[in-house]
Amino acid sequence: MAADNAGRWPGQPPGPPAPTHPASSVSLRWRVMLLAMSMVVISVVLMAVAVFAVTSRALYDDIDNQLRSRAQMLIESRSLDIDPGKAIEGTAYSDMNAMFYIPGRSKYTANQQGQTLPVGQPEQDVMDGTLLLSLRTVEHQRVLAIRLASGNTLLLSKSLAPTGKVLKRLGTVLLIVGGLGVAVAAIAGGMVASAGLRPVGRLTQAAERVARTDDLRPIPVIGNDELARLTETFNMMLRALAESRERQARLVTDAGHELRTPLTSLRTNVELLMESMKPGAPRIPEEDMAELRTDVIAQIEEMSTLVGDLVDLTRDDAGNAVHETVEITEVIDRSLERVRRRRNDIQFDVAVTPWQVYGDAAGLGRAVLNLLDNAAKWSPPGGRVGVGLTQIDALHAELVVSDRGPGIPPQERALVFERFFRSTSARSMPGSGLGLAIVKQVVLKHGGTLRIEDTVPGGTPPGTAMHVVLPGRPSPAGSDEAER
């Protein structure tokens, strides 16, 4: 992701979002509960396996220790040398099977009821002297064979059946306890999921309420955790949506109000023309007819300008603009050509530095044209308008459009960028009251700033200087200041 953002322009919006994957059909509550159950099941299984393994190993080690201890006792007591038959018979009382083998002479054996001490090849090897010791499990018995220093062999075995029963009972207990643990985990997971996701449920209900009823009331914020911040973010979205709808309603209302005046005047003039064309109606003098035609054309142009401005505003609001690298100097040149055709009596003093901005070329062109049109409109006949573009730091350049008109009072400077605002002195001038609103909207969307100052502070008249700061970079064509 860092590599994707490294080459991004100042103010450039992020690229298209990554493709999303189909959402799971399992609800978030079930996923949380299943996750908790899975963790508990894994923990219970690991614990049960560990307990069973440790217990099993301990029980088998205990049997081995019993066999070794019994053999050691028989050897150290020398009872096998004194009376081997009695010693082997006594071993049977300790739940063990025993055999004492004296090569070439005799074999003493004592077994538990229903059991036989198994003698296999390992035990035979000990009896033959090939091995000194053998310890193994065979026929559900643990068998120990030891070669004594006298050449005799002692064999002991103990049944594993009691140990198997203990381990079986232990497995049953672990299974029951584990099952209860999973059940408790499922119940606890469901309760935790219900309690933890209750704010998400409120958000879902609020979103459904907005979609169903257009009710944009904020949701109460409880706590200060992540879900509370999510609720605050959702409330911010609701406020932004409410403000957007309010702006749309205000735009429609203001547009209807602004269109009413030229439409009424146009309708009156058209009706007057139609009445004059009826048979027997008095003819309008040619001078008045020419004035009437001029008024109709002016009213149509006024409505066309207003509709065009409204289209520009709604286009920017919709966010459908195509962003690309824009040469601001070229935008200024094209705008100057259009303004000069309308006001060829105005002298434009241009000094610009090559500068590029990543953004909407059409929107930037409209903003620059509106600034130049506004300056030309308020300039006296034969006046001069200054147009300057200078780099103020590595990432920003400032466009200044100044005139020598009457200026804007300080108390109105914050209002001139509002839609349809027209000061008392401006109401007698042509215009829709949307030009500077478009400028503000375009500049802010490109991450810029704007302010109003006097061209000649304290002068009579003071004039107006519009300062627009735009992020971007120097044009590769060069950074020397160009004079036009």
From Swiss-Prot:
Side Extracellular, residues: 53-172
All ranges on the Cytoplasmic side of the membrane: 1-31, 194-484
Pfam families: HAMP, HATPase_c, HisKA
Catalyzed reaction equations: ATP + protein L-histidine = ADP + protein N-phospho-L-histidine
Bilayer-spanning residue ranges: 32-52, 173-193
GO cellular component: plasma membrane
Disulfide bridge positions per record: none
Residue ranges constituting the Histidine kinase domain according to the UniProt record: 254-474
Membrane topology: Multi-pass membrane protein
Low complexity bias spans: 1-10
Region (Disordered): 1-23
Domain annotation HAMP: ranges: 194-246
Cofactor(s) this protein cannot do without: Mg(2+); Mn(2+)
Record Gene3D superfamilies: 1.10.287.130, 6.10.340.10, Histidine kinase-like ATPase, C-terminal domain
PTM (free text): Autophosphorylated.
Compositionally biased region (Pro residues): 11-20
A molecular function (GO) term: ATP binding
Residues annotated with Phosphohistidine modification: 257
Compartments where found: Cell membrane
InterPro entries assigned: 2C_sensor_his_kinase (IPR050980), HAMP_dom (IPR003660), HATPase_C_sf (IPR036890), His_kinase_dom (IPR005467), HisK_dim/P_dom (IPR003661), HisK_dim/P_sf (IPR036097), Sig_transdc_His_kin-like_C (IPR004358)
Annotated keywords: ATP-binding, Cell membrane, Hydrolase, Kinase, Magnesium, Manganese, Membrane, Nucleotide-binding, Phosphoprotein, Protein phosphatase, Stress response, Transferase, Transmembrane, Transmembrane helix, Two-component regulatory system, Virulence
This enzyme's EC code(s): 2.7.13.3, 3.1.3.-
SMART domains: HAMP, HATPase_c, HisKA
PANTHER family registered for this protein in UniProt: SENSOR PROTEIN CREC (PTHR44936:SF9)
Biological role: Member of the two-component regulatory system MprB/MprA which contributes to maintaining a balance among several systems involved in stress resistance and is required for establishment and maintenance of persistent infection in the host. In response to environmental signals MprB acts both as a membrane-associated protein kinase that undergoes autophosphorylation and subsequently transfers the phosphate to MprA, and a protein phosphatase that dephosphorylates phospho-MprA.
Protein name per its UniProtKB record: Signal transduction histidine-protein kinase/phosphatase MprB
Organism of provenance: Mycolicibacterium vanbaalenii (strain DSM 7251 / JCM 13017 / BCRC 16820 / KCTC 9966 / NRRL B-24157 / PYR-1)
